[in-house]
Amino acid sequence: MSHKIYPIGIQNFEKIRNDGYFYIDKTALMYQMVKTGSYYFLSRPRRFGKSLLLSTLEAYFQGKKELFEGLAVEKLEKDWIKYPILHLDLNIEKYDTSESLDNILDKSLTAWEKLYGAEPSERSFSLRFAGIIERACKLAGQRVVILVDEYDKPMLQAIGNEELQKQFRNTLKPFYGALKTMDGCIKFAFLTGVTKFGKVSVFSDLNNLDDISMWNEYVEICGISEREIHNNLETELHEFAAARGITYDKLCEELRECYDGYHFTHNSIGMYNPFSLLNAFKRKDFGSYWFETGTPTYLVKLLQKHHYDLERMTHEETDAQVLNSIDSESTNPIPVIYQSGYLTIKGYDEEFGMYRLGFPNREVEEGFVRFLLPYYANVNKVESPFEIQKFVREVRSGDYSSFFRRLQSFFADTTYEVIRDQELHYENVLFIVFKLVGFYAKVEYHTSEGRIDLVLQTDKFIYIMEFKLNGTAEEALQQINDKHYALPFEMDERKLFKIGVNFSAETRNIEKWIVETKN
């Protein structure tokens, strides 16, 4: 039986190595990066191993050879020189006031000044930072290594607060600008974050920064690949399958469906979310481990603010320029959602340079769509999961009347804000409901110009539904018959329901449905 200790939530490389935690060797890629450049930026979703990568770099630049015993870099590195390191972690503060950023910068600068001395004439954060870099280089006789974890956390937390975001930007831009000013004293700089802010970037002065976020050669630098699972966790896969009472192949398929699917460039291999994957191995159970550690409230607010058509999210198309930049004034919520890890690259059109996006895996898709429901429908967060269970039971038992009455209750008490965009609201609610039902039954969903048609299949029943806005239920049913939507099921023995539904803008609800049955 395997006795691996999984480093869940542990981001300190030294602790992982000294205390015998499981570690997947990323040091060959790290070494390649160090030897082929000086300034790097990497964006990955939260809990994807960015902090551990920084901690690994820190141990390497401290010359702690003993920690790398048995790892690839042990044979690659000959010198193991110790460099002065300035490690700034912006992850530990909640940025709700301009002082919160000032406090954390001041705290770090003060700690470094105790090591390398202070100069009274250096009043601003950027001057103090530049002075520290210069003095550290002189004192140590080696150039300085700078590591910044979650450089963008203040900016992300201020999305929607234009004034605060501007203050943070005005503080961070000159601060990071010191990296360019002090280039001669810097050996290596690595900044990580979830996002890359565009035109108004705090990096606009740092044009020598290599953004490796979409470089194919560094796809595996964070996260876990299928190859790495089989090379490092083969015994554990068999134990996991036995504990679940399923075959090895079935387990691999379920792990892939739940946690794989992150693509950070076109034609790249899929990466597994390490946080969810290691939790699943530790507990020998499937859960929404990553999703539950952070709620995407600010993303949902962005979607609502920009009146976004949710159905588009499953096949959104965009180019690299949009994907890679977040402009605080932008009306497009997609880059933030992509960079936060709720969407990923699903395809690429080489001719036009367009990326097709979608949800990476079931954990994210189901978690995100479930999370949306209380924001769009008349249902609270506590009741929400039970409502979906009831929907599923009703369609499985052929009880379409209860199903539609429940759907009506979702549209009750629609706010005035939503009324302004009636059609989009009703499409969004139906998309969420049928997407969630689709995790338990087969659903094909199509929408165009104010009408929605869908086919929902269970073991015993087939439902063909046509939804109209401000038409009649009779017209909707007629459409099903005129377009021969039931034709593919002619020989099917399951009971078939054709249902025409009308949604009234006046009552802001489902006004009527009529059903035609075929046994």
Region spans (language model):
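Phosphate-binding site recognition
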Residues: 1-422, 437
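Active-site metal-binding core of divalent-cation-utilizing nuclease and nuclease-like domains
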Residues: 136-140, 433-459
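Structural motif
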Residues: 145, 461-463, 497
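Mg2+/Mn2+-dependent nuclease catalytic core
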Residues: 165-170, 469-486
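Conserved catalytic cores of phosphodiester-cleaving nucleases, focusing on short active-site segments
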Residues: 430, 452-469, 483
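Domain-level recognition of nuclease-like catalytic cores that cleave nucleotide substrates
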Residues: 488, 492-519
